[in-house]
Amino acid sequence: MILFGPSGNSNSFYADGNKKSEQAFEWLAKKGLNAYEYSFGRGINIGEEKARVMRAESEKYGVKISVHAPYYINFSNQSDDMIEKSVSYVLNSAIKVRQLGGDRIVFHPASVGKMTREQAFELCKKNFDKLLTLGLAVINCNCILGEKLKRYFLKFHF
């Protein structure tokens, strides 16, 4: 089944009188959409109660939920501390997507920065292995540019 829906709430969502993300599922279902991406782009900041309510609404209206992990994930960073933070962001996103009733995390695995594309790619592959050892029970949906990176990440579902 193909899932289709927005990332976050659009201007038309608010123009229709909605105020909270919990209302998105009914609104989307009425529009014939069946997916919703909750964004943690600037941080993982949803409490357990809100996640519980959103999960109930998602299930009630048959709208599948995913999350977008923080934008500052970068498995091509040369700092071990920053790699550990990237792993932590994905791990915490996995915990939250499960609380929300979903099973997919969308994230951008790396950026080139001041390296060559080849250097960034090799570093990303090496550091991404740290994430794979966690055995997360979610599906990783990488937002990637470039064929080489795409071919590499297409083989991973965790």
Language-model-detected regions and their locations in the chain:
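N-terminal pre-domain/capping segments
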Residues: 1-69, 73-92
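Active-site acidic/histidine proton-transfer and metal-coordination neighborhood
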Residues: 76-158
